[in-house]
Amino acid sequence: MGIRAIVVDTAGTTTDLTFIQDVLFPYSVKALPDFLAQNQHNVLVENCICDTRDIALEPDADLNRVTEILQQWVREDRKATPLKTLQGLIWKQGYAHDEFKGHIFPDFIEAVKRFSAQNLRIYSFSSGSVDAQKLLFSHSDGGDLTEMFNGHFDTRTGNKLDKQAYCNILNTISLSPKQVLFVSDVIEELKAADAAGMMTCQMVRDSKQRTGDFRTINSFDKLVIE
């Protein structure tokens, strides 16, 4: 049957964690107050504000309090959908104004071209919104890579630590589990994908990184799909 599709995690796998933690997250924390004040009546932003109140169990929170909640969630690396949606919108402005370029490991840039030439389908799965993923890959330091991808998945598909999220991906792309390889640096995500029947491979870019019983690679150069 063989592998027909590869699903990649982003942070720590295709993208350096320090870019997320030291560039993108601080940028969103700093930009949130003005962004919410200027866009609070935009339907999408308004929905995110309402969802934040609901999740925080603070239905009467004013805009300043909502901003504080969201900024705290960034610091806690919460995977809340309204936060991830707002971050995607904020980062879109940052990319548009050339505040930063999306960091992509060079070995993935070369590998994604190789996989595409092999007619393998390529998807990304991240706790960051689909829009944020598209921005990352379209404004990457390796150029626009979006045409190499067949799709992207985020928290709307499910929690990355839950088996059901990977079952949902399989249903969406209409492939059997053994036809799909999931690559991530996080053991718990690999366990969830494995429980759904997917093939798995752990990306270990740091020698101090925790590993499990999964096949490991330290670069996409080492990932050969026959």
Swiss-Prot record:
EC class: hydrolase
GO biological process, one term: L-methionine salvage from methylthioadenosine
Pfam families: Hydrolase
NCBIfam families according to UniProt: enolase-ppase (TIGR01691), HAD-SF-IA-v1 (TIGR01549)
InterPro entries for this protein: Enolase-ppase_E1, HAD-like_sf, HAD-SF_hydro_IA, HAD_sf
Family membership: Belongs to the HAD-like hydrolase superfamily. MasA/MtnC family.
Subunit structure, interactors included: Monomer.
Source species of the chain: Shewanella oneidensis (strain ATCC 700550 / JCM 31522 / CIP 106686 / LMG 19005 / NCIMB 14063 / MR-1)
Protein name in UniProt: Enolase-phosphatase E1
Pathway: Amino-acid biosynthesis; L-methionine biosynthesis via salvage pathway; L-methionine from S-methyl-5-thio-alpha-D-ribose 1-phosphate: step 3/6; Amino-acid biosynthesis; L-methionine biosynthesis via salvage pathway; L-methionine from S-methyl-5-thio-alpha-D-ribose 1-phosphate: step 4/6
Cofactor: Mg(2+)
Range of residues in the leader sequence: none
Enzyme Commission no: 3.1.3.77
Catalysed reaction equations from the record: 5-methylsulfanyl-2,3-dioxopentyl phosphate + H2O = 1,2-dihydroxy-5-(methylsulfanyl)pent-1-en-3-one + phosphate
Taxonomy, superkingdom: Bacteria
Annotated keywords: Amino-acid biosynthesis, Hydrolase, Magnesium, Metal-binding, Methionine biosynthesis
Primary role: Bifunctional enzyme that catalyzes the enolization of 2,3-diketo-5-methylthiopentyl-1-phosphate (DK-MTP-1-P) into the intermediate 2-hydroxy-3-keto-5-methylthiopentenyl-1-phosphate (HK-MTPenyl-1-P), which is then dephosphorylated to form the acireductone 1,2-dihydroxy-3-keto-5-methylthiopentene (DHK-MTPene).
